[in-house]
Amino acid sequence: MAATRIQPSTREIFTTLEYGPVPESHACALAWLDTHNRLLGHYVNGMWLKPEHRNPAPCQDPITGENLASCLQAEAEDISAAVEAARITFKTWSQLPGTARGQHLTRLAKVIQKHQRLLWTLESLVTGRAVREVRDGDIPLAQQLLHYHALQAHAQDSALADWEPLGVIGLILPTSFSFLDMMWRVCPALAMGCTVVALVPPSFPTPLLLAQLAGELGSFPGILNVVCGPVSLGPVLASQPGVQKVAFCGAVEEGRALRQTLAGRGATLGLALGTESLLLLTDSADVDSAVEGVVDAVWSDRSLGGLRLLIQESVWDEAMKRLQARMAQIRSGKGLDGAVDMGARGAAARDLAQSFVDEAQSQGGQVFQAGDMPSNSPFFSPTLVSGLPPAAPCAQAEVPWPVVMASPFRTVKEALALANGTPRGGSASVWSERLGQALELGYGLQVGTVWINAHGLRDPAVPTGGCKESGSSWHGGPDGLYEYLQLLGTPYRESFLCESLNYDTFGLAVSSSLPSGPETGPSPAPPYGLFVRGRFQSPGTQSSRPIKDSSGKVSSYVAEGGAKDIRGAVEAAHQAAPGWGAQSPRARASLLWALAAALERRKQVLAAQLERHGAAPTVAETEVELSVRRLQTWATRVQDQGQTLQVTGLRGPVLRLREPLGVLAVVCPDEWPMLAFVSLLAPALAHGNAVVLVPSGSCPLLALEACQDIAALFPAGLVNVVTGDRDHLTRCLALHQDVQAMWYFGSAQGSQFVEWASAGNLKPVWVNRDFPRAWDVEVQGSEQELSLHAARTKALWLPMGD
């Protein structure tokens, strides 16, 4: 009796041309786990730590459910030990010449190349991602990151001579992010002289392997320390003494909670939130190429999240038909199968996608899925949702992997309104064969990265980040380096947490000015009004507050602004912002020059005003002269705020754009009332922002005097100055959801409140934590730090080829 033939014959294979399995062996990954007896701990200071009495968490194959190993979950003392090791190593690592650090990173890149099979096998095995994406994408890019940042370290001593490393960096990664996301943040931190403590999920041991490879280089084992534990331990890591910055990747609500928890603790916070991306398909696009772009964006295991797809109505039917046909060809299977397009992400990701699809159907959406999957399957079919009303909750919610939510649009203006109408601003691609239309959409999208006729391109030299609720931190390119640097001489960031600060009542108890007796001198001048919408006007409270001179006598009155006045000022700024942002650099520069000339003509009056408030004559004259010079400095720099070309390893240029933040709130310090006001106003205007300012509390008259010239030169509503109780106005601005960024220079309690309140719309904030700033020193008053905070970066990719 003939044996039963299981495998197809060669003729059948060439007739059907069906895919067959191309399995990769996971023997090397299992062998590495066996060397640890299938029990992993933490990697700290070049050693494996397996403390007793720790709860183990399983590390499972997300497809088969097989228990591959167990990983001990960290507790507070484990994190403290890792931070201490990083802090001690920082003292020597940061003092090394940049050349030596660059050589160390190059050696690490060679070690990764040597052990790349182990890395991509382990990563694919434990995450379920398609092995070809990890092997052909993640590992080569990780090596490129190390080589690029090694070169940046070589140039640090000359190109970044005025900057110094921050210190110990805390990195928090959730389960949905890969080891490559860790590399994007670890490489610039190490290159600039920082050391890293990473908190990673216990179910993903690849970061532990990476730390082991770095530790085995021998010279500086404590530069990269990895502890395993849930995201809930993030506040424990962030609050450790010595941690100067926390980089967090994860969900929006987790980032919002961490922002509030870290308020007042001294460490800066860099957020990269959400995973959704956007794709705009116009009627002039190559539809087949755009469909492949959708596959790359969400169904190729390159992306971590879902996709919001906007299709022009004239090609809606054709695009949807071709997309559904392409979905039927996508192969799901084990990640270690080389012929698989899409693997599995585990039960949590599958349940989240199913919940979103069920909710979308209940709200009127139409669902198309390529193939049926059993309810107990670890895989989730590629899913296309359409027909949702624009007001449906799912139409505004973040789209999870592997779901595409499609919506039609008619015009470019409508496409921008739909695309920018969500609180997320991560990445997007524009598909159009008309370059002018593509650039118009690319410039108009409120996101951090835009690809033209491509999706998901990455290069170490190109900055990647986001805006709005996607976070405001950057990695890659020069922007990623500044995330881990501070100006020379910046005070050490210690915790300034005020435990007694009541967030519910801060700024609500407005101090009242009681009569102090009969006036014996000449009557003070009539009170200044609030400067809103280009003119002085009475405050909503119809009250004023006294301003005293150096002798303690009342010299004048200013308006007592409140919440109603802040609302009006922010509304006026929003109306003026689009027009000012669209102005050419030459037009903005000419107005800044004109303001400098106007203040110079009135320098004697302004200096006399400063003298009445206690400034020595020479100091007052110097402050006015520096203010004029500061305006002139930023007027000359306006031309440098445009786009620059970035060289990458791919064919085609990348435009690095510097875009306005929008409406910027600024609370000025009490010291240097004229110079600080101008030093903060000038870069904000130079970069195209509209501004709402609270001037010096002790001497606001100089700012109001300058507003007389601002009213004659600048568009109405572009600059708004509100006087009153600083804490109360700070509260109103920090809690305002339409303020898109905020700078605060005041008390430690005010800095803490601003950081806490910014979690509402996750606006980027810059606070001084009660440390005085030398505004008369050029480096602190007009240098690159102000420019970095005054605008956001957008990378616009223009790849070439068919």
Swiss-Prot record:
SS bond partners: none
Tree of life domain: Eukaryota
Residues that span the membrane, as ranges: none
Region (Disordered): 513-554
GO molecular function, one term: aldehyde dehydrogenase (NAD+) activity
InterPro entries: Ald_DH/histidinol_DH (IPR016161), Ald_DH_C (IPR016163), Ald_DH_N (IPR016162), Aldehyde_DH (IPR011408), Aldehyde_DH_dom (IPR015590)
Family: Belongs to the aldehyde dehydrogenase family.
Subunit field text: Interacts with SPG21.
Name by which UniProt lists this protein: Aldehyde dehydrogenase family 16 member A1
Organism for this UniProt entry: Rattus norvegicus
Gene from which the chain derives: Aldh16a1
